[in-house]
């Protein structure tokens, strides 16, 4: 277990573990307490549920302060809306700050990252934040929490954990389907008392239609331009579509370059009629 690993590291380095503390801010059924009891260490359990199995209830991760400090914080958040907790597992109505009731994945991720920042700052020097997350498939889209969440401190380890007895195990799907059968544990170490390195995933988009890159060849520019038109274009149409592209602007003989590229790749461009070509494969 992660608890054993962290304890072993401290003992190997000759550090005192008599006041070792495990904190679980979303403790659920209280599994963390059982682990702490097994290794005879102090445990602190919080949960939004007003009446949790163990520990302090009615604790709001988005609004309440972490009044304690810990050597290991085990954070197992909801997986967005896969399982609704308040108003379903406990309570009679959804709680507005329950991460399992976020209106969008973006809102969920913002709140998840807020929790990660808060919990990491509650670590003692040399402490670890263990974050257990999974993947989500929702409304035809795939979301990977471990890929999207922010990292703080030193990224010490990444563990893959198998999931068993999943709902998808017994379902039949009309479309090809890759089941989600794993969870991931990210172990983040607080190596310095004050300095906190971090990384946040950034996303963006660019259009090849008006962007030049060192890795973009004429062949792939022409091929993708033809894909965008359904797979067939005349040379005149290619000249028109690509004439304003940065590659063409930098090459006064771009029309000749387009013709030469098509000639150099007969396995990709098929002659249809005079001055007209189509891709050798069907465009999706």
Spell out what each predicted region is.
Residues 1-264, 271-284:
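Class I S-adenosyl-L-methionine-dependent methyltransferase catalytic core
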